[in-house]
């Protein structure tokens, strides 16, 4: 039973880490996947239980407030605070919209901004965009199509004091 539980955990971890096995290319990972003893019912349950009802609401509200630039086929969404995986879920969904080739989804926490970047065009490397957005004010990185990062609010305000104060004034007037 312990080996089956461990096999189930390893199988599901590999499933999630390889984008549902679509990015499974390492022969060792492939061999492990084929040799694991796992609970298929548990895997099915895990696959279909990825977010809570609250996270669904956060994602839905965020997607209603999408900012889109038609010239660059680029979208930006500001989300309520949530797990970084939900930011990725929103980004993945947004990239499925016709005409959206690159997107950034972000939210604020007590010390800064978490963000998720997606791109499906060769002209925009998600990891490079993530690095660019956080350069000198946080950290970012990932893969060619999917990346993420964090921006320190303190470092952002120090580097861009005018932008921050203008944004704060604009935001205050909107309320």
Q: Would you name each region that the model predicts?
A:
Residues 1-113, 118, 145-146, 150-168, ...:
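A structured phosphate/pyrophosphate-recognition subdomain
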Residues 19, 137-138:
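A short glycine/serine-rich beta->alpha loop
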Residues 98-102, 130-137:
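Short amphipathic beta-strand starts and helix->beta connectors
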Residues 111-132:
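Nucleotide-binding motor/catalytic cores of P-loop/tubulin-like NTPases across gene-expression machines
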Residues 141:
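Glycine-rich, small/acidic residue-mixed loop/short-helix segments
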């Amino acid at each position: 039973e312990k080996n089956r539980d461990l096999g189930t955990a390893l199988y599901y971890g590999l499933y999630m880490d390889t984008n549902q096995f679509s990015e499974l290319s390492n022969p060792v990972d492939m061999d492990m996947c084929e040799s694991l003893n796992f609970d298929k019912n548990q895997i099915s349950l895990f696959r279909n239980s990825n977010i809570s009802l609250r996270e669904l609401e956060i994602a839905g509200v965020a997607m209603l407030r999408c900012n889109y630039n038609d010239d660059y086929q680029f979208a930006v969404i500001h989300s309520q605070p949530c797990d970084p995986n939900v930011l990725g879920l929103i980004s993945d969904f947004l990239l499925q919209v016709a005409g959206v080739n690159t997107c950034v989804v972000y939210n604020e926490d007590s010390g800064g901004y978490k963000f998720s970047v997606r791109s499906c065009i060769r002209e925009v490397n998600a990891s490079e965009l993530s690095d660019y957005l956080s350069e000198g004010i946080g950290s970012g990185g990932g893969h060619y199509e999917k990346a993420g990062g964090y921006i320190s609010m303190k470092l952002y305000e120090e580097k861009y004091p005018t932008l921050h104060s203008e944004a704060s004034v604009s935001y205050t007037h909107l309320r």
